[in-house]
């Protein structure tokens, strides 16, 4: 009789433990689903904010380029434009060293600068947006 009692109690304990483990797994999976949903919502909000910032930066850069291309320039504007040309050459030399040397020998005209501005927008905006994303992510993490 003792042996049957020990086996029955052991079986009950094992089945209770198995049910407990199963409930824990379900609970964890439900928490994972909820966490994933909240992360998706946060990412969606972050994506919308970054999209707005990106659009604003693109507009500002295009406006700046069109101002320098179409408008009359003062001496100060001319200096800014020369610095911009130097920055563009430096960026080109980092990305495409063989083409940069070729461009430096023939100089820049206003149309080339405007074209470079739009080509470089994506290359310049990438790190800027990732930095902004990191800052926003840090803020959201601190708020949460």
Curated annotation (Swiss-Prot):
GO terms for cellular component: extracellular region. The modification Asparagine amide is found at residue 70. Its main location: secreted. Belongs to the bombinin family. The modification Leucine amide is found at residue 143. One of its GO terms (biological process) is defense response to bacterium. This is Maximins 2/H1. Disulfide bonds: none annotated. Keywords: Amidation, Amphibian defense peptide, Antibiotic, Antimicrobial, Cleavage on pair of basic residues, Cytolysis, Fungicide, Hemolysis, Secreted, Signal. Pfam families: Bombinin (PF05298). It comes from Bombina maxima. Expressed by the skin glands. Residues 1-18 form the signal peptide. Maximin-2 shows antibacterial activity against both Gram-positive and Gram-negative bacteria. It also shows antimicrobial activity against the fungus C.albicans, but not against A.flavus nor P.uticale. It has little hemolytic activity. Residues 19-43, 74-123 form a propeptide. It is found in: Secreted.
């Amino acid at each position: 009789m003792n042996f049957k009692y020990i086996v029955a109690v052991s079986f009950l304990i094992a089945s209770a433990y198995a049910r407990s483990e199963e409930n824990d797994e379900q609970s964890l999976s439900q928490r994972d689903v909820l966490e994933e949903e909240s992360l998706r919502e946060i990412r969606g909000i972050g994506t919308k904010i970054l999209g707005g910032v990106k659009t604003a930066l693109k507009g500002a850069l295009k406006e700046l380029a069109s101002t320098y291309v179409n408008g009359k320039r003062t001496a100060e504007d001319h200096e800014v434009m020369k610095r911009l040309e130097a920055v563009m050459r430096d960026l080109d030399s980092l990305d495409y060293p063989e083409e940069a040397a070729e461009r430096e020998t023939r100089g820049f005209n206003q149309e080339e600068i405007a074209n470079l501005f739009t080509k470089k927008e994506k290359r310049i905006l990438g790190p800027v947006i990732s930095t902004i994303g990191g800052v926003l992510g840090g803020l959201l993490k601190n708020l949460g």
